[in-house]
Curated annotation (Swiss-Prot):
This is GATA zinc finger domain-containing protein 11. Residues 16-96, 111-181, 221-335, 409-515, 619-650 are annotated as: Disordered. Residues 116-129, 261-272 have a biased composition (Polar residues). Transcription factor that regulates morphogenetic cell movement during development. Residues 16-79, 130-180, 221-260, 273-334, 442-511 have a biased composition (Low complexity). The gene is gtaK. The lineage of its organism: Eukaryota, Amoebozoa, Evosea, Eumycetozoa, Dictyostelia. It holds the Pfam family GATA. Keywords: Metal-binding, Transcription, Transcription regulation, Zinc, Zinc-finger. A zinc finger (GATA-type) spans 522-547. GO terms for cellular component: nucleus. It comes from Dictyostelium discoideum (Social amoeba).
Amino acid sequence: MENKFLSGSSELFSSLYNNTNTNSNNNNNNNNNNNNNNNINNTTTTTTTTTSNNNLKNNFSNKNNFSFNNSSNSLSSSFGVPSSPPPQKLNNSGYNFNSSSYSSLVPNIKKRSNSLDDNMSVPTLQNFTNNNNNNNNNNNNNNNNNSNNNSSNNNNNNNNNNNFNNSPTSSPTPYVPTTPLINSYPSSPFLINQQPLSSSTPFPFNHQPYHIHPFTTLSLNNSNGINNNNHNNNHNNSNNNNNNNSNSNSNNHNNHNNNNQSIVPQSIHLQSTTPQIQPLSLQPPQQLPTINGPTSTPPSSSNSTTTTTTTTTTPSTNENSNNNNNSYNTNNNNKPEIQLIDSGAILECFIELRDLGSSISKQSKESMVSGDFANGLERIKVTLSTLTNKIETLDLSIQNIIQNEPRSRIFGNSSDESRVPVLTRPRRFRKSKVKSKENNHHNNNNNNINNININNNNCSTPLLQSPQLSSSSPSLNSSHDGDQHLSSPQLSSSTPQHKSNGNGNTNSTNNNKRKIGELKQCTSCGTTSSPEWRKGPAGNQSLCNACGLYFAKLVRREASLTWKPQSVVSVNDLLCAGKDQKQSNTTSQLTTFINSVEHNQQIFQQQQQQQQQQQQQQQQQQQQQQQQQNHHHQQLQQQQQQQQQQQLHH
């Protein structure tokens, strides 16, 4: 925020001294202002100062003029609008802003208490009236603010400054921001309304525009405005040296050494457009780069130097140099001492370095995702500063260790057993596990052998009659004096049945050694730890679980690929069989076709025969019908003949 404020307000300062004031001949008004300021200096309480109508008119004539009202420590700005009555002061918690003045033009302003710090109080901001005549000469002439005014005005200004210095103050005057920010986002955060400065506008500083001096302070005058005597500089286009209290052509050179350290903004003359105003930033300044420009006035004499203490650096300004070489000497005495690190904490420090590096990458990724590159860069700067400090501390610590401990473990000597372990990925199967298992087996076997010897010495019964229990429960052996001896649990696999002869101990040790030497090991991957052992090409339980499953899969695949029929058939037989099969197929097809044709012929013949038979039957039926008809006709004729004969007889 401070960087945006200072960079954004640099252009306002570049046009700070380009104002044309219309009240250069108002000597009466100036005298009235001086009288009012004398009254203020005689009292220690804050009073409300009034300005004449002429001064108000002069203020209102400048449209881009900012006026700061000191009544009840409130800020007000007017853009050609009459000033409001003085607001009331709140209960030491903030300032009551009038809705028609500054708060209406500057929304969302942050209210603060009367003190920026516990030991710093906000000074009274006076009513701003320009009673000076700034003659910006392009011909290398000095711009003395009060050069055209009466000498009485200069004397009054000097008296006012002396009275201000003699007034009792409980604490040094704090830092007050000089100008509000100009909102030119998003196209450019540094240009004012996207309009470049005119060619006739001279830059008051001997440096590039858009930059502001980090320790630039304006003197506070008690004459109802700003004492611009501390800025009697050469404002010209030929880049002359700007020295406070050194290049003035008037007789006021010795009267400008006033110990005024508070900052009050001057009137700002921008171009024809009205800027958009952001809230004032009341945060104290931080460490900024050194830029040549007008600086604060020195105390008491021109040969003395002023030191402005910030958070990290203490710059000193040489006000009396004619070449305007403002040198800022940084005191490194306040830097904390580096604590050396012990050789045992080197590993932890390197882990911190690794974490800091990864955090930088994470922060850059977050800024790329969110698009907030400004805040992301600030976070990366903080992390990088801690990283560089850690590296410097490690460098000094390692150099000290090299000098004092030449055989330290930071060199990673292989002979040193207590060296810092290397952070590497552990292997899947460690040999240390095998060693630990062998050691456990040796210990168990030794315990079993000792228990057997104790039982042989203490028991009256033979060893064959002593109870042998399983591996899950301990064995209880009775002694001759009636006490019970609890032996360690004996594994059934490591304690075979012993004979009653004297060679039982030797046989048990030989068997145990043989079983220890026969630790299972996978013939494929070489591992000695597996939840289950499987069959392999070397025999049963020769492969670990994973290798055995893969081997079984391969065996099944080979069996499916290498299947052969029971009767071995040659290639010729297979070819001949194929030919025979083809021939048989063709013959079968022919036979089926012939059979089908014959069958069709038979069916056709049968159909023809049936048709012939039907025709014959029909013919026979017709013949029979004709015969019957003929017979019937003959009978009728005979009857008729008989009747005729009978008639003839009668």
